[in-house]
Each structure stands twice: as C-alpha cells, then as structure tokens.
C-alpha cells in the first residue's frame, strides 16, 4: 500500500516526465508517435521510481524504451531541475512498457466470446489444463 507521500511524489514525477518526454518528441520533430506516462510508483524508501510508459504505435515500443533507457541520465537531470524545489533527492528511474491495455483487450475478447471453444474445437488445446 502506497503512502500519501509516495503518491504525491509519484504524481509530481509523472506530470513532469510527461512534459519532458513530449517536449523531446516535439523538439526532435518526431511525428506519428505518442508517449504517455500511465503510472509512476515510488518505493517505500523513495529511492526508486518505476515509470510505466504507454507508446502508440505499439510496434515502436521496444525501440522507444531502449532510447529512453539510454538517455535516462539526461531525463533524470531535466527532472531534477524541474522538481528541485519540491524534492531533495530525485529517485532513480526505472522505465517499463505498460501492457495493461493489451491485457484488457485479451480479457474483453475472451468475455465477448470471439474465441469460443464450442464452435471452434481447435481452441480446446489452449484451454486444457496440464
């Protein structure tokens, strides 16, 4: 369970990271790319912040994640300049791709019955318990 302090720090980091990442996209003239920070969770010791990114189009996600990880120290420096009056120490950043939308889509497809094993017997192998 996150404390109020962790939630507040996560919110501050999330807001400023969105500004930093979207500013870099605009500055470099990259079109047809949307990066959003879906969640930031901070550890209890406030030492590490896990940043979950949503990238559209999804095919570019691994490439974008690698470029963000390679520029992590520059991003952390920009972040520290923005939050220097709010935080004494900026937590280390760990970036991850947020795949919750894919997970939700798979659940919706299963509930909608698009993969109905009664109508299509080939799907039964996937559903068999081992």
UniProtKB/Swiss-Prot annotation:
GO terms for biological process: maturation of SSU-rRNA. One of several proteins that assist in the late maturation steps of the functional core of the 30S ribosomal subunit. Associates with free 30S ribosomal subunits (but not with 30S subunits that are part of 70S ribosomes or polysomes). Required for efficient processing of 16S rRNA. May interact with the 5'-terminal helix region of 16S rRNA. Monomer. Binds 30S ribosomal subunits, but not 50S ribosomal subunits or 70S ribosomes. PANTHER family: RIBOSOME-BINDING FACTOR A, CHLOROPLASTIC-RELATED. Pfam families: RBFA. Keywords: Cytoplasm, Ribosome biogenesis. Belongs to the RbfA family. This is Ribosome-binding factor A. It comes from Flavobacterium psychrophilum (strain ATCC 49511 / DSM 21280 / CIP 103535 / JIP02/86). It is found in: Cytoplasm. Coiled coil: none annotated.
């Amino acid at each position: 369970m996150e404390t109020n302090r962790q939630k507040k720090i996560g919110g501050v980091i999330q807001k400023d990271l969105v500004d930093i990442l979207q500013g870099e996209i605009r500055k470099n003239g990259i079109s047809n790319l949307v990066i959003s920070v879906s969640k930031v969770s901070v550890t209890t010791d406030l030492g590490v912040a896990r940043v979950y990114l949503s990238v559209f189009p999804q095919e570019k996600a691994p490439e974008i994640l690698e470029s963000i990880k390679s520029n992590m120290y520059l991003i952390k420096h920009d972040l520290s300049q923005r939050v220097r009056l709010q935080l004494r120490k900026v937590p280390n950043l760990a970036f991850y791709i947020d795949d919750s939308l894919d997970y939700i889509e798979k659940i919706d497809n299963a509930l909608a019955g698009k993969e109905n094993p009664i109508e299509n017997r080939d799907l039964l192998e996937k559903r068999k318990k081992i």
